[in-house]
């Protein structure tokens, strides 16, 4: 049985990352990708996981993500970046969370990795971000930097983290 959540992902030239991200969410009911006209194999890879791929010229992180959210069709949306992964433990926890009606959104900790090493200090852990929310209660705050989801309702916290693989090399 598929997890009844829509995944919303934005991409631009993410062929190095996107397959691992999509593989980690392949058992979600819906995956929506909004691509900013990638010039690599990103879209080709995405086609192996979803047919819900939309093109939108780059307009900033918040605008791209809001467009992706608007294309989803399920009551719950999870925004995932191309360099992030959802673990089995996180899938189990969020499946349980959405089965009750206590909250309209959830902050999820991010476990950030730099050059393959987990960054535990300097404010990089637990790095809570609001990524899971009821579509009818949340939207992106449109601003230049540090975009975030705004939820009109109660928000809770999840214990299991998203794995975030930032820079794998100094060239990245």
Region spans (language model):
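N-proximal low-complexity "stem/linker" segments adjacent to membrane-targeting elements
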Residues: 1-24
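Active-site acidic short loop of glycosyltransferases
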Residues: 2, 27, 51, 72-75, ...
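Acidic helix N-cap motif at the loop->helix transition within catalytic regions
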Residues: 17-19, 40-49, 89-90
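A conserved acidic beta->alpha catalytic loop
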Residues: 24, 35-44, 81
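Conserved beta-strand segments of alpha/beta enzyme cores
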Residues: 30, 52, 154-156
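Conserved donor nucleotide-binding strand/loop of the catalytic core
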Residues: 43-71
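Catalytic-site signature of metal-activated, phosphate-bearing donor transferases
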Residues: 66-69, 76, 80, 87-172
């Amino acid at each position: 049985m598929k997890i009844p959540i829509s995944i919303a992902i934005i991409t631009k030239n993410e062929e190095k990352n996107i397959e691992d991200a999509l593989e980690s969410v392949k058992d979600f009911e819906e995956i929506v990708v909004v691509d900013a006209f990638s010039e690599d194999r990103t879209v080709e890879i995405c086609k192996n996981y979803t047919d819900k791929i939309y093109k939108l010229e780059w307009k900033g992180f918040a605008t791209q993500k809001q467009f992706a959210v608007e294309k989803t069709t399920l009551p719950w949306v999870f925004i995932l970046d191309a360099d992030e992964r959802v673990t089995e433990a996180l899938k189990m926890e969020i499946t349980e969370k959405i089965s009750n009606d206590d909250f309209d959104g959830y902050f999820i900790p991010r476990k950030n990795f730099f050059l393959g090493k987990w960054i535990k200090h300097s404010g990089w852990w637990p790095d809570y971000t609001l990524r899971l929310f009821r579509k009818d209660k949340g939207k992106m705050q449109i601003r230049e930097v540090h975009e975030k989801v705004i939820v009109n309702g109660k928000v809770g916290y999840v214990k299991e983290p998203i794995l975030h693989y930032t820079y794998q090399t100094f060239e990245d």
